Amino acid sequence: MRVVSGIQPTGDLHLGNLLGAILRWVRMQDEAAPTDQHLFFLADLHALTVEVDPAQLRANIREMAAALIASGIDPDRSILFQQSAVREHAELAWVLQCTARMGWLNRMTQFKDKSGKNKEGASVGLFAYPVLQAADVLLYQATHVPVGDDQKQHIELARDIALKFNNDFETELFTVPEPFIGGGTAARVMSLRDGSAKMSKSDPSDMSRINLTDSDEAIAQKIRKARTDPEPMPSEPAGLDGRPEAKNLVGIYAAVTGGTIESVLADHHGQGFGSFKPALTDALVALIAPLRRRLVELRGDGAEIDRILAAGADKARVLAAPTIVEAYRVLGLTR
Ligand code: TYM
């Protein structure tokens, strides 16, 4: 098994990232067989596709690395690195841009969402973004790519690109990766203010998300203010249909406590959200507070974070190099 995944170093790590991706990365790392390999990276080249504040980006890279380590990524067992430090990502991305088709990228919903009404003003990088993401995983012959549901379409594109390249050049160079989306309730954590929007770093309202950096009081306040409805908790999952905010809070509680929607409803049905919310707050504080404390400690040692990232990049480069060499050979660029 070769597990590869990334996160953009923009803004704070939030509960959606944790449940949809990071805590699953940690579990895969912790349950790994000795021959499995895990590569996790800060997708800083992806962060260039929208407006860049260089000082902010520099700070965010360290902060996100510290947040991943605080969440349980162990640099001795996983390869943790900065995408831009391994040049092969950008190099392979170019090659794969010549394999991917305009029509495939035109179907990517994230570009439509992120460019909004201003398609003409969006960067070319924002459009080509999913091809760089394909390069990120194909470079390492990833077998499993653990991501939240919102990234599924991008991983499916990576599969299409791998298949077309292999087919066009009569090679088996690229392993076709599997998107590895969490089962249960964590694959798509929604905003606390709007059950139809996903929890996201880019939501202007901080009340919409729980951050790794939130104090216990901030978590309690956000849950207190989270949108719900006046109905009591149902006894069956079907009773959550048409109640996206209620469903989201039950889903979060299930994911955080290791339960299922059914088990949460079995314990809490008939209650109003006024009494469910304190239980949810306690569960979230129990999850977040220890990670936040570790993050604060790690922040104090920027040099150590830099050392970890540099060592990770050295290891990643060794794994990346043969893919580029072989890609250039089958393309006719080298003998
Ligand atoms: P990013 O930085 O937006 O998010 C990092 C991870 O968190 C997951 N996630 C969520 N999961 C559940 N509910 C949510 N509300 C939620 N919000 C975010 C994302 O699905 C993701 O797994 N393009 C990627 C980064 C990337 C990448 C890659 C991922 C670059 N190259 C190669 C995998 C493989 C992104 O912007 O994720």
Residue ranges of predicted features:
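Short helix-capping/linker segments at secondary-structure and domain boundaries
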Residues: 102-106, 139-146, 254-264, 292
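Short, solvent-exposed beta-strand edge segments and adjacent coil->beta transition regions
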Residues: 10, 142, 205-207
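N-terminal Rossmann-like or analogous alpha/beta NTP/dinucleotide-binding catalytic cores
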Residues: 2-135, 283, 296
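Conserved nucleotide- and phosphate/pyrophosphate-binding catalytic cores
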Residues: 15, 153, 159-335
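Internal, conserved structured core segments that host functional sites
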Residues: 116-165, 169, 191
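A generic secondary-structure signal for well-formed alpha-helical elements
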Residues: 65, 72, 100-103, 142, ...
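An acidic site on a long C-lobe helix of protein kinase domains
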Residues: 60, 88, 153-154, 245
